[in-house]
Amino acid sequence: MKFTKPLLLLIVAIIASSNAAETFSNFQVTNSDASSPCVTTPVELKVNTCQSACGSILNVLPVTGSTSKFTFNQFGAQDTKCAATPTSSNEFTCVDGKSKVAIGTTTYSVVCVPDKTNSSESDSSDSTRIGASFALFALALLSMLAL
């Protein structure tokens, strides 16, 4: 029974680190409309921000209770504050990092850009998390051996 407390700590730490949900607040958007200014060059959209992009007024809003579902809204050309009811809207989910979203007659390609958990985190964050998990496991193992 010496191992009970360290083993429970290890299990809780593993569950906590594996349940960390990926969050998104930036999206790179292109569309297939030949007259659009963002056919080849992606435009960056931010969550909860009314922006002029791809020849339209757009905003992306998070769906309550989800870290990966969003509502993509298109507004009339004069509604630069996104104050009126959207002219078109559709919900999308960031699953594989890339989604196709049809809004009105336009289909947008949306690349979901994962948030960084801190400013020093780089694109190699997966290997950093693996290293941290290994260190946590080693610490728990050492504490079990010390008992």
Swiss-Prot record:
Record keywords: Cell membrane, Glycoprotein, GPI-anchor, Lipoprotein, Membrane, Signal
Chain ranges passing through the membrane: none
Membrane topology summary: Lipid-anchor; GPI-anchor
Glycosylation sites (chain numbering): N118
Residue stretch(es) of the prosequence: 119-147
Superkingdom of this protein's organism: Eukaryota
GO cellular component: lamellar body; membrane; plasma membrane; side of membrane
Signal peptide coordinates: 1-20
GO MF terms, alphabetically ordered: actin filament binding
Lipidation (GPI-like-anchor amidated asparagine): N118
Cell compartment(s), UniProt: Cell membrane
Modification after translation, per record: The GPI-like-anchor contains a phosphoceramide group, rather than a phosphatidyl group.
Family from the record: Belongs to the ponticulin family.
Name of the protein in question: Ponticulin-like protein C2
Source organism per UniProt: Dictyostelium discoideum (Social amoeba)
Underlying gene: ponC2
